[in-house]
Amino acid sequence: LDDFVPANHPLRPIKQMVNAALLKMDALLGRMYAADIKGGRPSIAPEKLIRAMLLQVFYSVRSERQLMEQTQYNLLFRWFIGLSMDDSVWVASVFSKNRERLIEHDTVIELFNLIVQQADEQQLLSGEHFSVDGSLIQAWAGHKSFVRKDRKDDQDADGSDGESKSGNDSDNSEAGNFKGQKRSNETHASTTDADARLYRKGKTASELRFMGHTLTDNRHGLVVNARVTQADGYAEREAAKAMINDARQAHEDPDVSITLGADKGYDAKEFIETLQAMNVRPHVAQNTSGRRSAVPDEI
């Protein structure tokens, strides 16, 4: 299959980086699958699962089922995952069965950290100049699942799964007709994803969402830290403080001032003061729309 992949294809260096990281994770992956080695049912190699999950992200494949369908005929996918032309693809349920195991052992976090370590070893990171940003992530839950918490508690008590007897959410009057109702995260929760929060930002409509946050090293624009939080008005700044604190702790010289760039949504007094206390210079855009900016003018 290697002959079918162009020499300059962008997946080639990515596969090299991923394989180098996976090689260092051999002991971790061995512990994860020790039960299978001792006589349990053989599992799909975790290295192949991880590479397949990366393809799903790179190519925005909506589901594991679609990913496996495409892998069946896509030679590039087979090459990246490590499948030959004759190998059978596995069923999509394999991802569900193994995802908890990957999460339990922080496998993806370890892979990410090892990739960042490679970038550092190649002197691609400054370690001193960063930017932070957040974005909304739509939850896999709809408005119809967002019902009153007391109603959800009643359903849990009587053993109901929250669906109508016909299995159609539209039969539920509250779930199907929510226009004009006052709904908030204090009084309502999603029966599909209890961690999702009803949230809107700017001119966007209110949706059940999470928030994703990234910390980028400015030298080459590489993401060096990332996390997902519940969606609220404080999440961006709280996540930024945690991530830049990690960067601060990782720097060899605590006296060296590092910088953090951010948009005007991060212009809040408590956030700016926290950065300054960490010896982090806040390169934050000033928000002067009907208010006084917390960012000092000299910055």
Predicted regions and their residues:
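Short linear loop/turn motifs
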Residues: Y33, S289-G290
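C-terminal structured "cap/appendage" subdomains that terminate the fold
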Residues: N279, E298-I299
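Polybasic low-complexity intrinsically disordered regions
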Residues: Q72, I81-V280, A285-N287
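Short, charged, surface-exposed secondary-structure boundary motifs
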Residues: R291-E298
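Short, flexible loop/hinge motifs at secondary-structure junctions
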Residues: L1-D2, R151
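ER/Golgi luminal nucleotide-sugar-dependent glycosyltransferases, focusing on the catalytic module
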Residues: H9
